[in-house]
Amino acid sequence: MLQKVKDIYSESIQIQIAASSMLSENITNATQMVMQCLLGGNKVIACGVSRSYANAQFLVSNLLNRYDLVRPSFPSVLLSLESAVGSSLVFEQPPEELYCHQFNASAKSGDLLIAFAPLGTEKIVLNIISHAVSKEVNVIVLTGSNNDAIQGILADKDLEISIPATKESRILENHLFVINALCELVDQTLFPSA
């Protein structure tokens, strides 16, 4: 079992090394997109399904509350399937449409959708990305290597951060790294003296 733990660490580290050379520019560009959105008086809208929902929730928590710095809250919304709202949407909508009502009620030009699709096949997320593109809402999507369906729906102004991995657990932990890097860069850039 000890060797298996070491193998998991090694696998994770190798993906981090590959990602650092492949994704640094995309993370920088994503930071710029988030700051442009927030400085324009707009909001970040985040979504994910299954285990990536937790990453979307973590991003919104960091934006609303704080990352490292005590600072004003950044406007952000989590598209949610929880509570009575989620229950009524699940009951009355086709599965791929579950986020559309929430998105339509809150999204406006200048907002930014950050979507998590580690497998690249999550129909709910693919649908909301298409919806955002049609409404001309900018999109950042975090994926893994199996991302052909997503590449076909993004607009030129949108951004994909594709983790060089196919194993969902490694993709999710690297999405978490991207969230942390993004939040740290936004905080340090907008509040450099704090």
Swiss-Prot record:
GO BP: any one term: carbohydrate derivative metabolic process
| Lineage top rank: taxon | Bacteria
The UniProt transmembrane annotation reads none
GO CC aspect terms: DnaA-DiaA complex
Gene Ontology molecular function terms on file = carbohydrate derivative binding
Question: Which ranges carry the SIS domain?
Answer: 34-192
- Which protein family is it in? Belongs to the SIS family. DiaA subfamily.
- Pfam families according to UniProt: SIS_2
InterPro entries tied to this protein: GmhA/DiaA, SIS_dom, SIS_dom_sf, SIS_GmhA/DiaA_subfam
Designated name of the protein: Uncharacterized protein HI_1657
